[in-house]
Amino acid sequence: MKKALLTAIICTFAALQSCSSGKRSFATAMKGTETTNSTTGYTAAIREIADKGEFWNTLFTLVSNGSSKENVCISPLSAQLALSMTAAGATGETQEQMYNAMQLTGDINKSSKEIISSIAAPNEQCEVKIANSIWVNEKLDVKENFINTNKEYFGAVVENVPFNKATLSRINGWCSDKTNGKIKSILDEIKKDQRMFLLNALYFKGAWRKEFNEGNTQEKPFTCKDGTKVNVPMMNQSLRTSYYEDNAMQIASMPFKGGYQMLLILPSEETGDAELSKHLAGNFRNSLAQMTTCEVDLSMPRFKSEFSTSLKEPLKTMGAERAFGDNAQFDGISDTPLFIDNVIQKTYISVDEKGAEAAAVTAISMALTSMPRPVEKKVMNLNRPFLYIITDYAAEKILFIGKVGNPNEK
């Protein structure tokens, strides 16, 4: 079997409608298409995805194509918030490119504040936490308006500190604290030219509305991208839930308590990586709107995955080039010439019989320039690469997106 996507997206969408549907079966095996491990330049497929898709799908496609890992997970929302904090101090073409890459318009600061407030609202049944911080080298003179904007709209904690080993430890400790210990560190060192770090941390923990019975979990084969089979703990249950299928994919909703859901996406046998990305770009939200209530026999693996990546090249490919060069315009931050020298993101996700837990930290480093209706029965056996999406029904922002090609890969 060729390379196929397993996408992890913790996201936010409008409520999905439920209704009955006509009976059709969808039990074909899924084969993908080998993708190129490169993010340099816009391929025709990437350009098409970007033209008709959304930030999360374009970013994930670039990261996934550039990774040799079978399991990939990123947080578009964490990246977007960290980048928006930084863009608040950008001017001219630099700011324009950053917002265009994220496909953002309007009052970005106000929108970011609303997103943070809606996602982090108190929820007794589901835990979602967002935290932002800015760590400034005490030698850098930062403009007051930039600091005030990030405090007011992003709730950012601002620290003026010496850039030494003690501060490195504090930054990594902040990451661990804000992700309940799931992301223990984000930085290995502080380089001599670095003057500022802008961090976002995102944490999610939700319990299934209907848990899997652990007694029904069995060791079963999972077919990896190269056709090899590995035995994994496969969870099983039958549930009445929202469901959609077309010639390219199946989608089923696995609801959490507290208003979130995980969308599980299983590509068809004929749908490869590039085709799936383009299909999602053009049809994803319309597919969600067409989901109907079915009785789904669901099998999916229990798994845990950690992933780390640089988003620098994908973001440059998406058009935000000037922010990463010596001609970057961040004079809204400081009169000292600065540019983004890297965007690092680490993620964690765990899925088991009781629910799911996920975390992400994005670090941007700035350096000196140089009543149930009758329902239809469906079968969905996730014993090969598939996609999963966790959504909150109120907002419309992607929190996490990832890929698992082998549940045994840590």
Identify the residue ranges that each predicted region occupies.
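C-terminal soluble interaction/assembly domains
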Residues: N342-K410
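Non-catalytic, conformational "gating/processing" segments within enzyme and secreted inhibitor domains
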Residues: K69, S111-S268, A289-P372
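A generic structural signal for residues located within well-ordered alpha-helices
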Residues: L77, D193-Q194, L382
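Conserved short hydrophobic interaction patches
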Residues: A101, H279-N283, P314-E321
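Internal alpha/beta scaffold segment
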Residues: P267-T292
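Extracytoplasmic/secreted cell-surface and envelope-processing proteins
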Residues: T94-M98, G272-A274, F307-T309, A359, ...
